[in-house]
Amino acid sequence: MYNIGFTTVTFRKKSRREICQIASENDIKYIEWGSDVHLPPNDINALCDVLSLQEEFGLTAVSYGTYYRLGEENYSLWESITDTANAIGAKIIRIWQGTKASADVNESEFLSMVDETRVLADIASQKGLTVAFEFHNGTNNDNGKSSVEFLKAVNKQNVKTYWQPFSTDDDINNLKAVIHYLACVHIFEWNENGKRYSLKHGSKKWQEIFKIIDESKTNPYLIMEFVKHDSKRQLTKDLKHLRVLTRD
């Protein structure tokens, strides 16, 4: 059985309470809190609100979706981020692997990011937290090969990766490459130009994806992200179809 949830960045314009109500309406127990709008680090009022809402709606924080990027080397900020994740009960902190595509990262930059990641991981480990990289274009974590190369170089048990589709022919190979380092899957259906569709539109592809994940026995969290028209109704439809696809 998969642990299915969604991320608050799905509805950046909605309040924290509205998001928790949507989770409740869809029988969702797991949530990823984004740090850009709904839970900034060092915002005690937002934190207190999140803790109250999680208790009221019976929600468990899966991860803290931050926008910390390797290269910042801002360890005081990182301490605040880990404190926030720890406070809400999240075991995963999502960060970004630099600001350059893997093809543009030189050896010195690569090694510097490895060193920074080790420091971040050690701080996170003291609080029982896992660091997981967003799988995204425009970062070093933009394909399976570069992702695994970096994770092996870091060589920390509490450093993993997300995976998400790029709507290209490389999606399946990328997934297979990172499968044993997988913490979470961001789920959405769109084309290479960013046009959004219902999850059902990509059923055949997602069936293959879940077959690979099933066989790996890695059991990552499945986190719905973007939906067509930013629609609450579309999220409900996509979650229903996701449960069909995963037999959940």
Kindly give the residue locations of the regions a language model identified.
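Acidic-and-aromatic substrate-binding clefts and catalytic sites of carbohydrate-active enzymes
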Residues: 9-16, 34-46, 67-76, 101-105, ...
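N-terminal pre-domain/capping segments
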Residues: 1-92, 125, 156, 180, ...
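A short helix->loop->beta-strand "cap" motif at the edges of active sites that frequently abuts
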Residues: 59, 90-91, 129, 215-221
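Acidic/histidine-rich catalytic cores of soluble enzymes
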Residues: 30, 61-64, 121-206
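P-loop/Walker A phosphate-binding loop and immediately adjacent motor/lid segment at beta-alpha junctions
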Residues: 197-222
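Active-site groove signature of glycoside hydrolases
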Residues: 90-105, 127-137
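Charged helix-capping and loop-helix junction motifs
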Residues: 43-49, 75-81, 106-118, 144-148, ...
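Conserved active-site loop/cleft motifs that coordinate metal ions or position small ligands
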Residues: 184, 220-227
